[in-house]
Amino acid sequence: MVANLKGSRINILDLTKAFGHKTVLNSLNLEVAPGEFIAIVGRSGCGKSTLLRLVSGLDKPTTGGILLDGEPLRKLSHSVRVMFQEPRLLPWKRVIDNVGLGLQENWQSKATWVLEQVGLKDRAGEWPHVLSGGQRQRVALARALVSQPHLLLLDEPLGALDALTRLEMQYLIEDLWRERGFTAFLVTHDVEEAVALADRVIVIEEGRIMLDLPVRLPRPRDRASELFINIREAVLEQVMNNESNNKNQLLQMSH
């Protein structure tokens, strides 16, 4: 039903966001190519979720701006979808109705198809409360993808899942991203998750980009490889603000 959707290009231009006297993001500049998978990591309160809200159009910058496919972003676009840590399913609607929410023509066939993509076609007629946490997040992923977005924003969507389910969801998200070609923008606390999924890992500290690291490893990523482990540990050191971290060495690792 879908063949290689074009991902959106994002240009973040001198972006600042302040709440009162507190500056959360400070003169941020970032370019994301169409179809690229970006992971944003950093300590709690560093501004990564605020950045995602700004890119989604759910919030507005104090100064600076964001271009989505060359056009100023002023509100949530129909080509952008957000997936949160909580599935946010409507308990009074069945699974297929949650997925098809807001769709019009042929919505049932579209919803059924995307449920098949996430492995839940046989649960379409069930209520959300009978599903496991991982299954509910699969429904949330299906709901985000059913409208065929060009940009998928992922706000720590796997943070509440157990380790095995989280790993399964990571593989699922990666497979669907590779198949569809949308741009993916992931906010996560999990450095291993970031290195496993992203084309680039970006570390934010005190509202600024402190590291923008390409991860040039073949997919699917071998998490036991020495290079993967070295990159993961080096990014973690940067997140933990270890002064001995050498950014030039990081860039050499990715080649």
Swiss-Prot record:
Q: Does the keyword Repeat apply?
A: no
Q: What is its main location?
A: membrane
Domain of life, per UniProt, equals Bacteria
For this record, the Gene Ontology CC terms, alphabetical, are: plasma membrane
Q: Main EC class of this protein?
A: translocase
Q: How does it assemble?
A: The complex is composed of two ATP-binding proteins (SsuB), two transmembrane proteins (SsuC) and a solute-binding protein (SsuA).
State what protein this is by name.
Answer: Aliphatic sulfonates import ATP-binding protein SsuB
